[in-house]
């Protein structure tokens, strides 16, 4: 499966934005420069200025019509993003979806090595790819510091995965002996939640400082998982 011409342009724009981000060390400047290069003003008479939702966290939104291939675009975006990061950064991705139905579909698609989306990711990362459901993460099923260091790790989760109002969501914040090996995993101490055990899944994910792919940004509900990767 190949990218269509407009999808190629989208990925090209993403790559250019990442280049500008490294060059200028300013999200808003990179954003404005990208649009200016296209002959589009940023401000009152043009595109709205960059809006910061999370301080220091670059955000990119692909606006794609229904059937426009947003999932394939997301799959093609992972490599350019990590290529722009220091190589020591763990290659971890939270693939966040809005509903259980989409969760099941996305997990099935990404774990199917014959599917075009998974094939693309495998090619980009030399077949060193692990896809995890929430239950697999909670169980520590092939999820450990060695695996995370050696592979691209994709966590397919829903908003409900972190809602403390739901019993299943609270599991992500509970002490978890299966994730004990991650206690020794180096991290930015400022990324951890207070009053939450260090072995909790939410703490492990925050340590990894993942890239977050949001499926359908219109319905995103912010949770405590609000420190996606700083590029």
Predicted region positions:
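RecA-like P-loop NTPase motor core of helicase/translocase proteins
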Residues: 1-231
């Amino acid at each position: 499966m190949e990218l269509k011409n407009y999808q190629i342009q989208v990925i090209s724009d993403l790559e250019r934005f990442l280049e500008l981000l490294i060059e200028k060390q300013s999200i808003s400047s990179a954003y404005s420069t990208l649009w200016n290069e296209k002959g589009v003003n940023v401000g009152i008479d043009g595109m709205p200025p960059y809006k910061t939702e999370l301080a220091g966290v670059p955000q990119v939104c692909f606006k794609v019509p229904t059937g426009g291939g947003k999932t394939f675009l997301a799959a093609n975006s992972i490599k350019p993003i990590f290529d722009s990061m220091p190589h020591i950064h763990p290659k971890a991705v939270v693939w966040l979806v809005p509903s259980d139905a989409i969760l099941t579909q996305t997990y099935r698609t990404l774990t199917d090595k014959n599917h075009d989306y998974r094939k693309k990711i495998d090619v980009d990362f030399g077949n060193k790819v692990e896809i995890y459901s929430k239950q697999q993460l909670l169980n520590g099923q092939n999820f450990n510091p060695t695996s995370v260091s050696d592979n691209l790790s994709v966590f397919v989760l829903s908003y409900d995965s972190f809602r403390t109002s739901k019993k299943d969501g609270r599991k992500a914040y509970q002490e978890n002996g299966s994730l004990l090996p991650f206690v020794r995993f180096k991290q930015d101490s400022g990324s951890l939640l207070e009053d939450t055990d260090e072995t909790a899944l939410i703490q492990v994910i925050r340590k990894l400082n993942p890239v977050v792919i949001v499926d359908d940004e219109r319905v995103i509900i912010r949770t405590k998982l609000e420190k996606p990767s700083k590029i």
